[in-house]
Amino acid sequence: FEKADEVVAAYDAGRCDTYTTDKSGLAAQRIKLSKPNDHIVLPETISKEPLGPVVRQGDAVWEDIVRWSLNVMIEAEEYGITSANADSMKSSDNPAVKRLVGAEGELGAAFGLDNDWSLRIIKQVGNYGESYKRNIADTGILPDRGPNQLWTKGGILYVPPAR
C-alpha cells in the first residue's frame, strides 16, 4: 500500500487482520472505520517514536519559534498557568513564571518577538494539558496521555532551561 488511507480501507474491508502504526495514528485512523467501536487500539507499546513539530530546513529562527512555542505550553502546564489565569501570573512571586509570561526578562527578544508572545500563546491555545484535553482526549482519540504527561507525572515532557 502506498498511502495510509489505502491500508485503513483494506483493514476495514477485512483484507488485513491487523494494522500497526504509532498510537496517535491508530487512534486517528480508527474513527474513519465503518464501525470504529468494533476495533480497539491495544495498550502495548511496540516501539517508541517521538513526534513533534517540524519546519523546513534552513530557517533556524522559525524553527526556534515553533519549538519554543511548544515549550511555552509545556512549561505553562508545569507551573500551573492556564488560559484562564495567564494574565494574573504576571504578578507571580516566581521569577520563572514571570519570565514565561513576559513580565520579566526578554525571552521573546531571542526570537525577534515581543515579550507578550508567550502570554498570547497560553491565553489563546492554553497550556499543553489544556490543548491535549481539548484536541485529543475530549475527542476520544487518545484519552490517556501516557508519555504525553509532564515528567513530574511520569511522562517524558520537560523543557530545557531558557536564559
Where are the regions that the model predicts?
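A ligand-binding cleft/hinge motif common to bilobed small-molecule-binding domains
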Residues: D5, D12-A13, D17-I40
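A short acidic, often aromatic-flanked loop/helix-cap motif at beta-alpha or helix-coil junctions
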Residues: D5-V8, K48
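Extracytoplasmic low-complexity repetitive segments enriched in small/polar residues
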Residues: A10, G14-C16, E77, I121
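Extended ligand-binding regions for polar small-molecule ligands
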Residues: G25-L26, P43-D116, N127-G129, L150-T152, ...
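C-terminal capping/gating helix-and-loop segments adjacent to ligand/active sites or protein-protein/ligand interfaces
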Residues: N115-P143
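Secretory-pathway glycan-assembly enzymes, especially type II membrane glycosyltransferases
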Residues: T139, P147, W151-T152
